[in-house]
């Protein structure tokens, strides 16, 4: 039976971890929002929006993070004149417990939602799963997003800012920002393809402990 099934199902893999797309999805749009510190860096001119205040007019950093998530998805959709009905699935997350910023944003966006908690891998994971959905014929367009906020991450992982702890100039700093890409089956887009960016394959990572 296994041999029969293997002959029926086309294998779109290379090795144990890499999947190959027979109809490579296209990246048709993207949008970004970042905080003031990120805007001062070398990539500052390339971001769609740089906030002047990392609370963005909200009364908590968590609400600002939720706002970044929602605004970035809507921004990517607006660039290619997509309404909510034109996106089949939203994939993404943040760094907080129960990916609360992403969940509250998804409530407002009213899109079918797959919440992901991959920390720094969330963007790559959302693109990988999203493009697999497209190549498999389960979705025509997907929105893939990751967001984080320095101040919420400090509370979650390190030292809440209210403690007033000092850090060294070389200390790690979690990004305040959000980035969204919209991937699509290129046969749906026609002249709307805004570049030659396609996802042709993806490699699924694995947890490795070298015992160090």
Task: Locate predicted features.
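Solvent-exposed alpha-helices and their adjacent loops that cap or buttress functional pockets
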Residues: 16-20, 82-83, 105-108, 122, ...
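Condensing-enzyme catalytic core mediating Claisen C-C bond formation in acyl metabolism
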Residues: 2-62, 160-212
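Short beta-strand segments
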Residues: 28, 92-93, 142-148
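Short, well-ordered, mixed-charge alpha-helical segments that flank or form enzyme active sites
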Residues: 99-100, 150-155, 206-210
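Secondary-structure boundary elements
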Residues: 78-83, 132-141, 184-193
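Conserved beta-ketoacyl condensing-enzyme motif
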Residues: 27, 61-120
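Active-site-proximal alpha-helical scaffold in enzymes
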Residues: 117-144, 183
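A glycine- and small-aliphatic-rich helix-loop capping segment at beta-alpha/alpha-beta transitions
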Residues: 42-46, 102-112, 134-136, 157-166
């Amino acid at each position: 039976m296994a041999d029969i099934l293997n002959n029926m199902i086309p294998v779109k893999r290379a090795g144990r971890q890499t999947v190959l797309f027979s109809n490579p999805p296209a990246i048709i749009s993207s949008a970004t929002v970042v905080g003031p510190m990120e805007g001062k860096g070398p990539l500052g001119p390339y971001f769609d929006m740089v906030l002047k205040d990392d609370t963005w007019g909200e009364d908590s950093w968590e609400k600002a993070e939720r706002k970044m998530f929602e605004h970035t998805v809507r921004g990517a959709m607006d660039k290619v004149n997509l309404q909510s009905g034109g996106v089949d699935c939203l994939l993404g997350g943040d760094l907080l417990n129960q990916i609360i910023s992403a969940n509250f944003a998804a409530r407002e966006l009213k899109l079918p939602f797959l919440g992901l908690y991959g920390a720094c891998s969330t963007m790559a994971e959302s693109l990988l799963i999203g493009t697999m959905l497209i190549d498999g014929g389960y979705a025509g367009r997907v929105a893939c997003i990751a967001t984080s906020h320095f101040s919420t991450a400090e509370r979650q992982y390190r030292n809440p800012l209210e403690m007033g702890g000092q850090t060294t100039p070389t200390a790690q700093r979690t990004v305040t920002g959000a980035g969204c890409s919209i991937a699509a089956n290129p046969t749906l887009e026609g002249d709307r393809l805004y570049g030659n960016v396609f996802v042709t394959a993806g490699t699924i990572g694995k947890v490795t402990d070298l015992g160090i």
